């Protein structure tokens, strides 16, 4: 019982530290993207260095931190808008039983970005019937799990919970609700949760 309590306390401290580091990475990414258009290479290098440092730190905790390390890397890739590696890392975190609203929010967000990219590519490749067939293939792979993960993240504390509701409505193709929620989110928190507007 003592060992289990010690592990739980260690994991809680680790998660708190991780949260602070992730907030710093995401703030840097968001701030850089809000500046006048410029080369983001410098900021990307800083974020990658932070990711490497975090990975090294987490490795020192051994088995206890494996899932958290994947989660941290997933969020780092997410901050860099590198969605394929973000998806891989977040899925590995969940397989290692890292749960919680924040993990599901990140996974849902990234799956949604994959869906948008796949739709864009389907339209470029032919449109019409071919794009509709592609949609049937990619919906269960990306869209359905994106909506499910976002819905599981509703307990997460956000500055503007309407952003999450708008994102879910957008992926459910309820565009009127999505726009209303996006408008409400912008009034509450002028800068949204990830520097992305619904539908971008």
What feature does the model see in each segment?
Residues 130-199:
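C-terminal luminal/periplasmic domains and tails of membrane-associated envelope-modifying transferases
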Residues 1-12, 17, 104, 175-179, ...:
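Short intrinsically disordered, low-complexity coil segments enriched in acidic
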Residues 1-147, 155-162:
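Charged/polar helix/coil "stalk" or linker segments at domain boundaries
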């Amino acid at each position: 019982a003592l060992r289990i309590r010690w592990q739980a306390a260690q994991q809680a401290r680790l998660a708190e530290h991780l949260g602070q580091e992730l907030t710093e990475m995401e703030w840097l990414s968001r701030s850089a993207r809000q500046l006048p258009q410029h080369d983001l290479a410098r900021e990307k290098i800083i974020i990658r260095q932070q990711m490497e440092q975090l990975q090294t730190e987490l490795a020192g905790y051994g088995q206890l931190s494996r899932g958290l390390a994947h989660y941290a890397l997933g969020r780092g890739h997410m901050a860099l808008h590198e969605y394929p590696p973000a998806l891989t890392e977040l899925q590995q975190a969940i397989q290692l039983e890292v749960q919680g609203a924040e993990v599901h929010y990140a996974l849902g967000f990234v799956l949604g970005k994959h869906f948008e990219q796949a739709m864009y590519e389907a339209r470029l490749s032919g449109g019409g019937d071919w794009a509709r067939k592609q949609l049937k293939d990619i919906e269960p792979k990306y869209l359905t799990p994106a909506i499910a993960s976002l819905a599981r993240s509703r307990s997460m504390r956000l500055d503007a919970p309407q952003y999450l509701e708008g994102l879910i409505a957008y992926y459910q193709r309820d565009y009127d609700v999505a726009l209303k929620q996006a408008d409400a989110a912008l009034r509450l928190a002028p800068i949204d949760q990830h520097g992305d507007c619904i539908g971008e």
